[in-house]
Swiss-Prot record:
CDD domains: HAM1 (cd00515). NCBIfam families: RdgB/HAM1 family non-canonical purine NTP pyrophosphatase. Mg(2+) binds at E47. It comes from the Eukaryota. This is Inosine triphosphate pyrophosphatase. Pfam families: Ham1p_like. It is an enzyme of class 3 (hydrolase). It comes from Scheffersomyces stipitis (strain ATCC 58785 / CBS 6054 / NBRC 10063 / NRRL Y-11545).
Length: 194
């Protein structure tokens, strides 16, 4: 059985990834998928400016070099249609700079409040190896903040077909429709086929 290190320091993201990949969490935050055991490590990786794909590839290659083995990284973006998909991969910095209400206010004068949540996982077997990308997209709208505000921008993103934000949805429902679920579903298929 091979070990893959999922590089994240975000405890909420780790719990969600493990729940989606395996449906349960074992001791120490490990998850088994096919012939792989997923373990966690927090690394402070440089994030270059670029597309979500470029950011993810850079993070995966950097993590593989540092850890010397198979790694999994993730990058998430939120793109506003009215802003030609900005803030995109810079959403984390927008949330820190202007807050959730600031993001909502950015769309105040725009009729189009639609947005896309995009999650991209990058898998790299080790130093010098190519990076495989797995991307999931969920369409929705930006709304006034509703629900808990402890997980990024979940409280302002309402997926199409639902009357609740990600933050208000039951975890099992969110984990069956989210951009992260869609990307992980592709990743799981890849890992099981190896």
């Amino acid at each position: 059985m091979s070990t893959v290190t999922f590089v994240t320091g975000n405890a909420n993201k780790l719990k969600e990834v493990i729940a989606i990949l395996s449906g349960s969490q074992s001791e120490g935050g490990e998850s088994k998928v096919g012939n792989f055991t997923i373990v966690n490590k927090s690394l402070d990786l440089d994030e270059l400016q670029g597309s979500i794909e470029e950011v993810t590839i850079h993070k995966a290659k950097s993590a593989a070099e540092i850890l010397g083995g198979p790694v999994l990284v993730e990058d998430t973006c939120l793109g506003f249609t009215a802003f030609n998909d900005l803030p995109g991969p810079y959403i984390k910095w927008f949330v820190k700079s202007v807050g959730l209400q600031g993001l909502v206010d950015m769309l105040y004068k725009f009729e189009d409040k639609s947005a896309k949540a995009i999650c991209t996982f990058g898998y790299c077997e080790g130093p010098g190896k190519p990076v495989q990308l797995f991307q999931g997209i969920t369409k929705g709208s930006i709304v006034e903040s509703r629900g808990p505000t402890n997980f990024g921008w979940d409280s302002i993103f309402q997926p199409d077909g639902f009357d609740k934000t990600y933050a208000e949805l039951d975890k099992e429902i969110k984990n069956s429709i989210s951009h992260r679920f869609r990307a992980l579903d592709k990743l799981r298929d890849f890992l099981v086929s190896q």
